[in-house]
Each structure stands twice: as structure tokens, then as C-alpha cells.
Curated annotation (Swiss-Prot):
A molecular-function term among this protein's GO annotations: electron transfer activity
Enzyme class: oxidoreductase
Protein family according to the UniProt entry: Belongs to the PsaA/PsaB family.
A Gene Ontology term for the protein's cellular component: chloroplast thylakoid membrane
Pfam families from the UniProt entry: PsaA_PsaB
Compartment annotation: Plastid, Chloroplast thylakoid membrane
Protein name as it appears in the record: Photosystem I P700 chlorophyll a apoprotein A1
Length: 750
């Protein structure tokens, strides 16, 4: 008799037509909530509508339904992203000087927006070179387009239309997977299949197809562009793909086809898959052949990683087993129970993802300038500054979001009855030790880092420069950072056999790379000034973490409010008769954390902006003499607080303040307006609810007198709503002020 292994049943993983498609709901604002659907009685209704519209947890407690709504919303998000991308490419095709820039990227500046002549706004169309007038853009799109091999505005048009089609497709998918074929809960919880598809599919095949595009399209086209061939003379992408001889003229190994691959003679391909390190001296970007090699390697890694987990066949890892095997000497049950948490709480899952993605985004910010990936990116100082600032802000917001969703998980999804002695339980049980130690670290860092500056300001004020902490008096050299720099500068020969230079010029040792008389990158010296500001970074980051982590660890209970979990994620105070219990909800910790995140990121981007202008960016003469934008003043000026105010904020604000009457005047208006938005936030943050309620009631009285009283009763914002409006305007105003300040400065001098 033949014993067969039982065939794995194909599971039905979707429900057909679960939710009727109907536009009637659209006409009923708040249809997802019994209270809101009744319509407004007071003005609080509109605030609650905004607060709860996307809080799917509050619509239903059915995890499957929540999962479907989130899944469907993701398609909507993708649709918006495609629409945005399409708009960017369309502007490149219709309103830009891309083809002119392509012919002379060192002298012509990128522009993709031309202002219409209404009320004199056309003053904003500055001369960007090549006879084109428009607004200079700093998004880096031109550099990406060149790196990917786009040579004409027609190609940008086609891509824009393609993105539009994809946007429509995503909208359709969002509708289809909620109304027509909605996945069952089991599908959302099948983590091994998800890892398989995300690792092997998205990251593996995604990287492989990008590597393929780079090898067959980007590399040959960029070879021609670098050699000065007119973009109109370069063969079109499909010609390189279809005609191997064309590629073989540029990369001889193509003549041999796949033979070297199958005979394991892979080094033959070293003409287009390189391992050089450093920057291409023609473009000031990473070697595109290095980048293609990198994506091929990443593809191989992720294709393997995607096949490590057990799906329909009885081979491979199970995530549950892996997690439960994790037991350290001090962690009790270890990761037991984490699998259940992460497959039933999307907040817990999202929290981890946001923390990872936020950290990764900040890593991207630091690599964009130290290893500029695209041609002519490094010499476009406005774009370099914008990319760094943008990725730092985004990273900061994502990390605060991680804490927010971790706290929501604790309040809504954490079940203390089933969690005993696992990792999370043990962390919660010694949370007092964690928070008090972290608090001590913050106090230590704050007093010492700030104290060094105060010392320097005092000595400077008293005319005693020899007693200051500086590179020319009492030195505090960042010896560990310098050691890391030197190790990397000397590393290439020892770590990577074929590499000719270190990963980044910033480590030191190498020469500078200049393109068209502008510095692309050079070794970045670190000294006492960097030592001081780095400890301010440590201080602000630790305080942000203290606030956010305290919010998470005390989200369910504290000595002050033992039953905090019953009050929910956001609440103003613990009811009447309990003084001193305001601002303790998990939401309030996120609110407070946002301000410290803003502090932390501001210091980072100020440090970056000034350091690069002082020690890196600048012009180079025919004799090889480098003249930096601010002439190397960072080391001596930034060691006092007065120096930061005088030589950075005030000195560099002159461009934005004096921008009226020039093409940069919009930044002058934004600078003013954003300050106003920021100041407006203080009205919400520094006032009490009762003050406004009293004011409203006297205004309503006046309306009643004139018989024009509204049917919907006006109400002051709740405490939480007021804080939400306050922090939003604080951040929006602060970020837009910084944006105007940075761009007016760097476009004028860079």
C-alpha cells in the first residue's frame, strides 16, 4: 500500500461581495459612528468627526473588518503617491528645463515651475541659466532622472501618464479588495507567506529589476552623457535592450552573453559590475556601476531570504518557533507570546515598522550627502540641504509615530491576563528603574552639554579665549569619532579586495572631488565644536526617548492613576476632584514628545547646514585653492551659544530678510508667514479652555440680541483638541520658517 503525505488543502482566503458599494454613506457624514451620524448639535462634532474618521478601532471591534479597512486604505495611499509622482514627472515634462540642464548640469540650475504673470508674481521666475526663467527646485528629481537614463521630456510625459494609470489601478484595487473580494483574517495573519512575498517579491525581484534597468539602460546612456554626447544622438532605451552588440561596444563582456555566468567566470562582468568605492570624478556621484552591482547583490540576498519561511510545503522556518526559541538569561519566557501580539495587534506591528523605517530614513539622510548616489547631486547644494533636512524631519515624525502606536497598543490591545513573565511583562515590571535611569542620563547630558557652552560664552564675554574649550585652547577632540573616520579611511585594502577607495570621501585620507569648479565632497574634519554639538544631540534625543518611552510604559497604569487603561488613549484629566492628574494620558506624551523631537531635529539640521557651508561646500580655483562658503568659521564660532545666534542664525538670515524685490521674495513672505503660524500656535498652547468658553458665551449673547444665533451651538475646543491644534501649528510654522531660511540662503550663496 502507498502511504501519501496528506495534500495541503488550498485555503479559500477571500470573502466575495462582503460590503455593498453605496454612495449613500457619503452623504451621511459620520456614518461610521452612532453618535456622529446624528449630525452636529455643537461645533465639537466637526472635531470629533476628524478625530475618528480613520480610527477604525472605534468603528468596530471585529479585527477582520478593521484589517480590511486598513488594507483598502493602503491602496488609497498608494494611489495618492502615484498621483503625486505623476505630477512631478508631468512638471518635468511640461514646465521644466530638464533637457537644457542635461546638456550642462554644472552651470544650469534645475527648474520645473514657471509662475504665471498675475499681480507681479512673475518676479519669482529667476534666471536659472540657459535662457530659462523659473523657480529653482531642490527636490533632486533631475538628478534621479539622469541616473535612470531619461534623456527627453517626452519620456517624462510617458512616465507621468503611466503613473496616472497606476494611480487609477490602485484606487480600483482598494475598492475591489474591500467590496468585491475581501481577504479573510487568516490571510492577514499568514506571516510566512507575507515575508515570502515582501522579501522575495518586493525587495528581491524589485532590486533585481532595478539592477537590470541600470545595467541595460542607465549605464550605457550615462556613459554617453558623461562623454558629452548630445542626448538627442543617444540610442533609445529599447535599442540597448534589444541590440546586444550596442552594449558590447561599451561593455565588452556583453559580447560573451551568459557564458561567463554559467561557467562561474563571474569576474568577466567586472566591466559593468564594479566595486570601486568613492565618487565618479566626472559627475561627483557614486559610480553607477557600483550601484548596479549593489542592487544585484541586494536582490540575491533578499531572494534567498524570501525562501526561508515555511508556507505550503513542510520546509523552512516558522516565525512562531523562532520567536519562542528566543530566551535570554534575564528574560524569563523571552519572546513567547510576541507572535500572538504581532498577529492580532496592528498597532504593535505598525509601531515596530515605524521605529525601523524612521531610523532607516535618518540613515538615508546621512548617506545622501556622504555617498551622493546621483550624478551632479553633490554640487547642487540647495538639493543636498533639502534632502538632508527632509529625511531628518520625516525620520523624526515616524519615530514619534512609533511611540504613539506602541502606546495605543498598550491601551487597546494589550491583555495583561495572558501575558506573564514574557519579555514585555518583565520590561513593564521594572519600568520605574528604566525611566529613572533614563531621566538621570537626560539630566547629566543636559547640564554637561549645555554647561560646556555656558562656560565658553562666559569666558568669551570676559575676554579670556585661552580658557575656552576650543581647538586652539582647551581641546576636547572627538577621539572616538576620529578613530572611526581613520579606520574607514584606511579600510578599503583590508576589507574589500577590489575596492580602490573608501566608501565615503568624508572619512578622510582621500583627495577632494570637485565638479565644474565646485566642491562635491572632501574629508570632513571633526573637532571640539563637533564634540560640543554632538552632546547636545545626545541630550535632545535622550529627552525625546524619555518622554515617549514613559508614555508607552505608563500607558495602562501608574502610581498616580492605577486605572489609566480604562480612561483610554487620550483624556484631559482623571475627572473632577483629582487635581494634578492632567496631561498624563498616552496621547499627551506623544504631544510633548513632538516638541522635543522638533528640538532634536532642529539642532541636527542647523549643525549640518553650518558645518557643510563652513568646511565642505565652496569653490575651487585653478590653483586648487578651496574657498568655503562661510570660510571655515564653524570650528571657532559654534562653540558659544552667542556664536550660533550671531554667526549662524542672524548672519545667514540676511538672504531671506533681504529677499524682497528679488526672485527669492516668496521665501521672505514665507519666512514672515510661517513665523506668524508658529506664534498663532502659542495662543492654543498657553491658554485655558474656560477663557474661550466665557468669550464664546458673550459673543453668542450678542448674536442672540441681533437674532442671528446659529443652530449649531458654538463650543470652545476641548483641552486635547486645543493641544492638537497648537502642536500642529507649532511644528508647521517652525518647519516652514526653517525651510524659507535654508532655501533663500543656499540658493543665494550656493
Amino acid at each position: 500500500m502507498i502511504i501519501r503525505s496528506p495534500e495541503s488543502e488550498v485555503k479559500i482566503l477571500v470573502d466575495r461581495d462582503p460590503v455593498k458599494t453605496s454612495f449613500e454613506e457619503w452623504a451621511r457624514p459620520g456614518h461610521f459612528s452612532r453618535t456622529l451620524a446624528k449630525g452636529p448639535e455643537t461645533t465639537t462634532w466637526i472635531w470629533n468627526l476628524h478625530a475618528d474618521a480613520h480610527d477604525f478601532d472605534s468603528h468596530t471591534s471585529d479585527l477582520e473588518e478593521i484589517s480590511r479597512k486598513v488594507f483598502s486604505a493602503h491602496f488609497g495611499q498608494l494611489s495618492i503617491i502615484f498621483l503625486w509622482l505623476s505630477g512631478m514627472y508631468f512638471h518635468g515634462a511640461r514646465f521644466s528645463n530638464y533637457e537644457a540642464w542635461l546638456s550642462d548640469p554644472t552651470h544650469i540650475r534645475p527648474s520645473a515651475q514657471v509662475v504665471w504673470p498675475i499681480v507681479g508674481q512673475e518676479i519669482l521666475n529667476g534666471d536659472v541659466g540657459g535662457g530659462f526663467r523659473g523657480i529653482q527646485i531642490t527636490s533632486g528629481f533631475f538628478q534621479i532622472w539622469r541616473a535612470s537614463g531619461i534623456t527627453s521630456e517626452l519620456q517624462l510625459y510617458c512616465t507621468a501618464i503611466g503613473a496616472l494609470v497606476f494611480a487609477a489601478l490602485m484606487l480600483f484595487a482598494g475598492w475591489f479588495h474591500y467590496h468585491k473580494a475581501a481577504p479573510k483574517l487568516a490571510w492577514f495573519q499568514d506571516v510566512e507567506s507575507m515575508l515570502n512575498h515582501h522579501l522575495a517579491g518586493l525587495l528581491g525581484l524589485g532590486s533585481l529589476s532595478w539592477a537590470g534597468h541600470q545595467v541595460h539602460v542607465s549605464l550605457p546612456i550615462n556613459q554617453f552623457l558623461d562623454a558629452g554626447v548630445d542626448p538627442k544622438e543617444i540610442p533609445l532605451p529599447h535599442e540597448f535592450i534589444l541590440n546586444r552588440d550596442l552594449l558590447a561596444q561599451l561593455y565588452p563582456s556583453f559580447a560573451e552573453g551568459a557564458t561567463p555566468f554559467f561557467t562561474l567566470n563571474w569576474s568577466k562582468y567586472a566591466d559593468f559590475l564594479t566595486f570601486r568605492g568613492g565618487l565618479d570624478p566626472v559627475t561627483g556621484g557614486l559610480w553607477l556601476t557600483d550601484i548596479a552591482h549593489h542592487h544585484l547583490a541586494i536582490a540575491v540576498l533578499f531572494l534567498i531570504a524570501g525562501h526561508m519561511y515555511r508556507t505550503n510545503w513542510a520546509i523552512g522556518h516558522g516565525l512562531k518557533d523562532i520567536l519562542e526559541a528566543h530566551k535570554g538569561p534575564f528574560t524569563g519566557q523571552g519572546h513567547k507570546g510576541l507572535y500572538e501580539i504581532l498577529t492580532t495587534s496592528w498597532h504593535a506591528q505598525l509601531s515596530l515598522n515605524l521605529a525601523m523605517l524612521g531610523s532607516l530614513t535618518i540613515v538615508v539622510a546621512h548617506h545622501m550627502y556622504s555617498m551622493p548616489p546621483y550624478p551632479y547631486l553633490a554640487t547642487d547644494y540647495g538639493t543636498q540641504l533639502s534632502l538632508f533636512t527632509h529625511h531628518m524631519w520625516i525620520g523624526g515624525f515616524l519615530i514619534v509615530g512609533a511611540a504613539a502606536h506602541a502606546a495605543i497598543f498598550m491601551v487597546r490591545d494589550y491583555d495583561p491576563t495572558t501575558r506573564y513573565n514574557d519579555l514585555l511583562d518583565r520590561v513593564l515590571r521594572h519600568r520605574d528603574a528604566i525611566i529613572s535611569h533614563l531621566n538621570w542620563a537626560c539630566i547629566f547630558l543636559g547640564f554637561h552639554s549645555f554647561g560646556l557652552y555656558i562656560h565658553n560664552d562666559t569666558m568669551s564675554a570676559l575676554g579670556r579665549p585661552q580658557d575656552m574649550f576650543s581647538d586652539t585652547a582647551i581641546q576636547l577632540q572627538p577621539v572616538f569619532a576620529q578613530w572611526v573616520q581613520n579606520t574607514h579611511a584606511l579600510a578599503p585594502g583590508a576589507t574589500a579586495p577590489g575596492a580602490t577607495t573608501s566608501t565615503s570621501l568624508t572619512w578622510g585620507g582621500g583627495d577632494l572631488v570637485a565638479v565644474g569648479g565646485k566642491v562635491a565632497l572632501l574629508p570632513i574634519p571633526l573637532g571640539t565644536a563637533d564634540f560640543l554639538v554632538h552632546h547636545i544631540h545626545a541630550f535632545t534625543i535622550h529627552v525625546t526617548v524619555l518622554i515617549l518611552l514613559k508614555g508607552v510604559l505608563f500607558a495602562r497604569s501608574s502610581r498616580l492613576i492605577p486605572d489609566k487603561a480604562n480612561l483610554g488613549f487620550r483624556f484631559p484629566c482623571d475627572g473632577p476632584g483629582r487635581g494634578g492628574t492632567c496631561q498624563v494620558s498616552a496621547w499627551d506624551h506623544v504631544f510633548l514628545g513632538l516638541f522635543w523631537m522638533y528640538n532634536a531635529i532642529s539642532v541636527v539640521i542647523f549643525h549640518f547646514s553650518w558645518k557643510m557651508q563652513s568646511d565642505v561646500w565652496g569653490s575651487i580655483s585653478d590653483q586648487g585653492v578651496v574657498t568655503h562658503i562661510t570660510g571655515g568659521n564653524f570650528a571657532q564660532s559654534s562653540i558659544t551659544i552667542n556664536g550660533w545666534l550671531r554667526d549662524f542664525l542672524w548672519a545667514q538670515a540676511s538672504q531671506v530678510i533681504q529677499s524682497y524685490g528679488s526672485s527669492l521674495s516668496a521665501y521672505g513672505l514665507f519666512f514672515l508667514g510661517a513665523h506668524f503660524v508658529w506664534a498663532f500656535s502659542l495662543m492654543f498652547l498657553f491658554s485655558g479652555r474656560g477663557y474661550w468658553q466665557e468669550l464664546i458665551e458673550s459673543i453668542v449673547w450678542a448674536h442672540n440680541k441681533l437674532k442671528v444665533a446659529p443652530a449649531i451651538q458654538p463650543r470652545a475646543l476641548s483641552i486635547v483638541q486645543g493641544r492638537a491644534v497648537g502642536v500642529t501649528h507649532y511644528l508647521l510654522g517652525g518647519i516652514a520658517t526653517t525651510w524659507a531660511f535654508f532655501l533663500a540662503r543656499i540658493i543665494a550663496v550656493g
